[in-house]
């Protein structure tokens, strides 16, 4: 994110650019991205009003079906903010506390880890995907119970002691989903609908199995370039196989949605529709490491204390053929959401242009 931080310095100087000029910056960036082959949807909003929303590219290249603004994308790691919210709701229901030991709920061979460590990627847990890739029978589909079983059986060492440093951990978010199931006795997928998606009327959002995705006509397939430089379905590549044999995992990914639903989610976080303002503020607070330094990852969100518009929280996602990002300038209620389905390499350039455009409309 160093490029983003450097951009902020420029943005502070440029933020007073004439409004029409700022809109032109975004329009030109969109046009350039489209010429470079970008396929996806971009939404820019401020204080409850959508200022810009545009789709470009293809839902499927094979059938030459054009993308629409309401099309549904894999969110990849943007899913973690929903998993974190499920934990926050559990906390407010009195089912757990953030500083509870993980061992209160889940048996794993890694003592000393708290729920907060899992939320903030400070647990030191090993990567579950590497374990499963080495040992799992890939003719079968694994989910959280199998992942937990293999963590216990093979018990690879931790990277560091809990709280010592930050290291991004998909394993931690698998365990968080399993904690939710343990304390509620409910399925995480169905409970996510009941606690988040249905109350917010996020009708296009869900944690879908592969066959469910195939049945959704408006689902934007992920694409990668083949040896001939043509975009083809990402599922034809060996590197995508894990999305099949880990197809039942819950917590670190698998949520699919569209930009309008994500904007409903964004706006709900200002209005205490799901949890209290106090809990949201804690979610957007850096974690203090054992050495006293701060780690700027909260509960499912990266945190930037300073930006052109004050405090910012954000997250990115990356699955085969998909790149996603949500940026929220929470002091001024400004939002940028970009969902891409052909692995566009320069998403941050679009974010930078959108940020400049938000200075004045």
Regions found by a protein language model. Give the residues of each.
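Short, glycine/proline-biased beta-turn/loop segments that scaffold the active-site neighborhood
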Residues: 98-111, 200
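Bacterial Sec-dependent N-terminal signal peptides
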Residues: 1-25
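A short acidic/small-residue loop/turn micro-motif
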Residues: 57-61, 246, 343-345
């Amino acid at each position: 994110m160093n490029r983003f931080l450097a951009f902020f310095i420029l943005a502070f100087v440029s933020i007073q650019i004439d409004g029409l000029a700022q809109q032109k910056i975004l329009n030109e960036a969109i046009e350039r991205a489209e010429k470079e082959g970008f396929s996806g949807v971009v939404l820019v909003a401020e204080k409850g009003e959508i200022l810009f929303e545009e789709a470009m590219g293809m839902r499927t290249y094979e059938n030459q079906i054009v993308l629409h603004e309401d099309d549904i994308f894999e969110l990849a790691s943007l899913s973690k903010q929903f998993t974190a919210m499920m934990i926050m709701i559990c906390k407010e229901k009195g089912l757990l506390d953030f500083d509870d030991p993980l061992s209160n709920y889940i048996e794993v061979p890694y003592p000393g880890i708290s729920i907060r460590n899992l939320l903030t990627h400070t647990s030191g847990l090993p990567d579950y995907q590497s374990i499963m890739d080495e040992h799992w029978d890939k003719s079968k589909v694994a989910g959280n119970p199998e992942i937990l079983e293999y963590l216990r059986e093979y018990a690879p060492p931790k990277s560091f002691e809990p709280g010592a440093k930050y290291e991004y951990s998909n394993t931690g978010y698998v365990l968080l989903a399993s904690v939710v199931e343990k304390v509620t006795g409910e399925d995480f997928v169905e409970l996510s609908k009941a606690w988040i998606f249905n109350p917010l009327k996020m009708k296009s959002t869900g944690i879908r199995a592969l066959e469910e995705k195939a049945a959704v006509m408006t689902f934007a397939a992920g694409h990668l370039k083949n040896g001939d430089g043509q975009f083809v379905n990402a599922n034809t590549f060996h590197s995508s196989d894990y999305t099949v044999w880990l197809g039942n995992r819950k917590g670190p990914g698998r949520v699919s949605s569209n930009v309008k639903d994500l904007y409903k989610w964004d706006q709900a976080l200002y209005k205490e529709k799901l949890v209290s303002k106090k809990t949201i503020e804690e979610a957007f607070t850096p974690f203090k490491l054992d050495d006293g330094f701060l780690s700027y990852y909260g509960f499912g969100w990266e945190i930037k204390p300073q930006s052109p518009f004050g405090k910012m929280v954000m997250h990115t996602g990356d699955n085969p053929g998909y790149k996603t990002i949500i940026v929220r300038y929470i002091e001024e209620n400004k939002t940028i959401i970009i969902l891409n389905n052909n692995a566009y390499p320069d998403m941050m350039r679009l974010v930078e242009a959108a940020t400049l455009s938000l200075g004045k409309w």
